[in-house]
Amino acid sequence: MDISGFLKENKESLKDLKEDDINEILEDYEIDNINDPKQKIRFFKQVENTRKRLKIEEKNRMLEEDINRMYEEEKNRMLEEEKKEFLIKVEEEKKEFLTKVEEEKQKLKTEVEDLKSIILTSSTKNGDLKGTTSYSELFKIKNSLKLIEENCEFKDWNIPSGIELKKHVINLDDCNQESTMQSKLDEYFKDFNKKRKLIITNGTKIKINSIISNRYCDYFINQKGFPFEPYWMHMVGDIKKGSISSDTNLDQVLKYIDIIVEKSNHHVLNRPMFGFLMNKTKIKFVKYDIENNKYYITIDYDLRIGFQYLSNIMIYLEQFIRNIPNSLQTILKNHTNDSVEFYYGATSSVFIVNKEFVYKWFNYPYFFQTEVKYLTFIDGIEGTPSIKQQNQTENWIQISPRGQLIKNLEGKPIDISFYTKVFCRNTQKHTSREVIHRDIRLSNLLMDSGGDPLLVDFGFANFTENEEFYQGTMNTASNRIYNILINNRTNHAFSVVESDDLESLVKVYIMENEQAVKRTIKSIPNSEIGLFRTMWEFFNTECFPQYSTLFQQAQNINYEELKNEFIKIDKIKNTTTTSNNNQNHTNIHKNTIANTTSYTNTLETSTTNPNTNTTTSDTNTSTTSTTNTNTTTSNTITA
């Protein structure tokens, strides 16, 4: 019997061994006669030894698996403990931040009350303001020691890279959408500031080549002259609608209102200027009187605008009402007891009725047709808002049947980071269909009363394969588009790119958080700046590998240069503030010397003229008292 026959005959005895194990045994022995009893004993003894060896190897393998499993469990337990500690620390920082916010709110309330007191004092003293003093002027007087000499210039509006933005990302459980947005954050910061500085340093006129045609050619100048580029005002308005506000940008908005109203006395306002004026004064239609065909209007003075602007505003408002389409006026008249808010843009206007219906009226049929075209392409007919078009002359869309952009959902503040993620996801939705919006800015990001985010105003939308002139808002244009325009190229026709919309969304997010970002960077000690890169590396490799792109970008930011830039700006402000303080101190010192001299003259007069001592002394004492009172009033206004 040969070897194959032998193996076949003893198949049951060898069934638990693999073919490789049996071949290995056969190689160890030269078996001439496989049926020899001694040879068979030796063979099966070797088979038994092989079985024992395999069992030992199996036990070792299982033991090694148990050790690895225990190691992984211990590692996961330690990571879970570290995660809990991290979340506790984040919660403590959040509470501390909210406490500071409440303190700032209380401080602002106190400031408003002081301002009201000044206004009442001025009214009592002068009998009435009578249109001679605006709220903005009083506000600037009150804050004169806090603001820099030219507080309405753009030079203090530096948009920093966002360490605070990345902190928000870490605090969220599911926000990997932001990693795509923020991967180019540092590059946007540099180019975005380049444009601002160019406008300031090059004097009164900087011509940007025509974007669409000659009639849209814009001139950028400072706020002391004309013509005035409307989109800079629009950007200021967008920032004011956000969550970050400061004395500096509030004064800028007030200054713009002053300029626009002054211009309206001599020139016809274009639509963006008029829209900015309407939005910032917060005019609302309250009720329509059917019998007398009149609108009763209320104005919210939250922005502290002056009384003398009211007549100018009413004139332009009446002109605008007459141009509203009849079909839309019918809708407004049906809501006679409801509040109707108006928001104005260069291509369309939005009407919010009773916070339940939002209507959008287009100034030109082209933009109406474009918006309907791309909304239908993205969402289909069923997902497209209600659309109405009459006789090719009246074009409007019902944007949302459930309401408007709101500040709170069920009493809870809006989480900007969360909704930015949602807007980013919506942006990726239409870019995946090869459609770009081309005009992403804060006023086009809405949210209805049900909490659903809306990206509106597709009037400038286009397909990515098309080549044509750029249309949209310059301030939030993508980095690529901005470089083309800022380099003064004569031909602005280029293929649009899907990432353009995403970059615009990043710029909107930066403007929303610029103050918080700046405070965070400035608070880092110089000796600890290097730790930030180590921190991002730890998060990248150990905790949140899904945010790899974001953390790698965070490691590359030049924090030293960024902090030095902030400190340099603060030094300029502090120098100006110190100069103003010294000037005020000198004026007070002069008043004190004058009062002392007056009192000395009183004593000399009393000694020289004893017969008129009582009368003269009483008179001079009264004069001194009046002078001191005026000094006190002056200090109150400039404090």
UniProtKB/Swiss-Prot annotation:
Residue ranges occupied by any Protein kinase domain in the UniProt entry: 233-588
Catalytic reaction equation(s): L-seryl-[protein] + ATP = O-phospho-L-seryl-[protein] + ADP + H(+); L-threonyl-[protein] + ATP = O-phospho-L-threonyl-[protein] + ADP + H(+)
Region entry Disordered, spans: 601-639
Enzyme class: transferase
Coiled coil (UniProt feature): 7-122
PROSITE patterns: PROTEIN_KINASE_TYR (PS00109)
InterPro entries assigned: Kinase-like_dom_sf, Tyr_kinase_AS
EC numbers: 2.7.11.1
UniProt-recorded Gene Ontology molecular function terms: ATP binding; protein serine kinase activity; protein serine/threonine kinase activity
Domain of life: Eukaryota
Keyword vocabulary terms for this entry: ATP-binding, Coiled coil, Kinase, Nucleotide-binding, Serine/threonine-protein kinase, Transferase
Binding annotation for ATP: 239-247, 284
Residues the record marks as active site: 439
Keyword ATP-binding attached: yes
Protein family membership: Belongs to the protein kinase superfamily. Ser/Thr protein kinase family.
Protein name, as recorded: Probable serine/threonine-protein kinase DDB_G0282777
